[in-house]
Protein backbone atom coordinates (compact mmCIF):
# COMPACT_ATOMS: atom_id res chain seq x y z
CA UNK A 1 0.00 0.00 0.00
CA UNK A 2 1.20 3.53 -0.75
CA UNK A 3 0.88 5.88 2.21
CA UNK A 4 1.45 9.64 2.20
CA UNK A 5 1.95 11.39 5.53
CA UNK A 6 1.26 15.14 5.53
CA UNK A 7 3.28 17.35 7.86
CA UNK A 8 6.41 16.40 9.75
CA UNK A 9 5.38 17.58 13.20
CA UNK A 10 5.25 15.22 16.17
CA UNK A 11 2.28 13.18 14.89
CA UNK A 12 3.45 12.91 11.28
CA UNK A 13 7.04 12.10 12.19
CA UNK A 14 5.89 9.52 14.75
CA UNK A 15 3.75 7.83 12.10
CA UNK A 16 6.74 7.79 9.73
CA UNK A 17 8.85 6.12 12.44
CA UNK A 18 6.17 3.51 13.12
CA UNK A 19 5.75 2.68 9.42
CA UNK A 20 9.45 2.85 8.51
CA UNK A 21 10.14 -0.88 8.45
CA UNK A 22 6.71 -1.98 7.27
CA UNK A 23 5.80 -3.52 3.93
CA UNK A 24 4.18 -0.23 2.86
CA UNK A 25 5.62 2.44 0.58
CA UNK A 26 5.58 5.51 2.83
CA UNK A 27 6.39 9.07 1.77
CA UNK A 28 6.29 12.06 4.11
CA UNK A 29 5.55 15.59 2.91
CA UNK A 30 6.57 18.75 4.74
CA UNK A 31 5.48 22.08 3.23
CA UNK A 32 8.50 23.93 4.59
CA UNK A 33 11.90 23.55 2.90
CA UNK A 34 14.47 21.52 4.85
CA UNK A 35 16.31 24.59 6.17
CA UNK A 36 13.05 26.12 7.50
CA UNK A 37 11.54 22.96 8.98
CA UNK A 38 10.87 23.84 12.61
CA UNK A 39 8.51 23.11 15.45
CA UNK A 40 6.45 26.22 16.03
CA UNK A 41 4.11 25.30 18.88
CA UNK A 42 4.47 24.29 22.53
CA UNK A 43 7.39 22.17 23.69
CA UNK A 44 5.64 20.84 26.80
CA UNK A 45 4.05 17.42 26.98
CA UNK A 46 2.94 14.63 29.27
CA UNK A 47 6.08 12.63 29.99
CA UNK A 48 4.37 9.24 30.24
CA UNK A 49 2.73 9.59 26.80
CA UNK A 50 5.91 10.53 24.95
CA UNK A 51 7.85 7.86 26.84
CA UNK A 52 5.39 5.27 25.49
CA UNK A 53 5.55 6.68 21.93
CA UNK A 54 9.35 6.56 22.02
CA UNK A 55 9.39 2.97 23.31
CA UNK A 56 7.22 1.90 20.37
CA UNK A 57 9.85 3.27 17.99
CA UNK A 58 12.93 2.00 19.85
CA UNK A 59 13.85 5.36 21.36
CA UNK A 60 14.46 6.54 24.91
CA UNK A 61 12.47 9.69 25.68
CA UNK A 62 14.99 10.65 28.37
CA UNK A 63 17.44 11.37 25.52
CA UNK A 64 15.16 14.29 24.50
CA UNK A 65 14.00 15.42 27.96
CA UNK A 66 15.01 18.96 28.92
CA UNK A 67 13.11 19.52 32.17
CA UNK A 68 10.92 17.21 34.23
CA UNK A 69 8.63 19.69 35.99
CA UNK A 70 7.67 19.28 39.64
CA UNK A 71 6.28 22.72 40.43
CA UNK A 72 5.23 25.80 38.46
CA UNK A 73 5.66 29.24 40.02
CA UNK A 74 3.04 31.71 38.78
CA UNK A 75 3.16 35.48 39.18
CA UNK A 76 0.09 37.40 38.03
CA UNK A 77 -0.04 41.01 36.78
CA UNK A 78 -1.37 42.26 40.13
CA UNK A 79 1.64 40.66 41.88
CA UNK A 80 -0.39 37.70 43.11
CA UNK A 81 1.93 34.70 43.37
CA UNK A 82 1.13 31.02 43.73
CA UNK A 83 2.60 27.60 42.98
CA UNK A 84 1.03 24.72 41.10
CA UNK A 85 2.22 21.16 41.68
CA UNK A 86 2.94 19.30 38.44
CA UNK A 87 2.59 15.62 37.72
CA UNK A 88 4.06 14.40 34.44
CA UNK A 89 4.50 17.78 32.75
CA UNK A 90 7.86 18.17 31.06
CA UNK A 91 9.64 20.10 28.34
CA UNK A 92 11.65 18.33 25.67
CA UNK A 93 13.73 18.82 22.55
CA UNK A 94 10.73 18.63 20.25
CA UNK A 95 12.54 19.35 16.99
CA UNK A 96 15.29 16.90 17.92
CA UNK A 97 12.72 14.16 18.49
CA UNK A 98 10.90 14.97 15.24
CA UNK A 99 14.13 14.83 13.26
CA UNK A 100 15.10 11.57 14.97
CA UNK A 101 11.71 10.03 14.12
CA UNK A 102 12.15 10.85 10.41
CA UNK A 103 15.85 10.12 9.96
CA UNK A 104 16.38 7.63 7.15
CA UNK A 105 12.74 8.07 6.03
CA UNK A 106 11.58 9.29 2.63
CA UNK A 107 10.49 12.88 3.30
CA UNK A 108 9.90 15.47 0.58
CA UNK A 109 10.38 19.03 1.81
CA UNK A 110 8.97 22.23 0.33
CA UNK A 111 6.41 20.55 -1.95
CA UNK A 112 2.77 19.63 -1.69
CA UNK A 113 1.83 16.15 -2.95
CA UNK A 114 0.03 15.79 -6.29
Short names for language-model regions:
Residues 4-6, 14-40:
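Glycine-rich FAD pyrophosphate-binding loop
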Residues 7, 42-47, 85, 93:
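Helix N-cap / beta->alpha transition motif
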Residues 29, 64, 108-110:
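Residue-level detector of family-conserved "landmark" positions at structurally sensitive sites
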Residues 31-73:
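N-terminal FAD cofactor-binding segment of flavoenzymes
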Residues 55-59, 68-114:
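Conserved N-terminal helical subregion
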Amino acid sequence: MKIAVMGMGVAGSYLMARLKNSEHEVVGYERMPTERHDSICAWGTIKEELTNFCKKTGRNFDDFLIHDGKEMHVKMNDNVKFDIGLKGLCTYNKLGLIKDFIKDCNVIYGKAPR
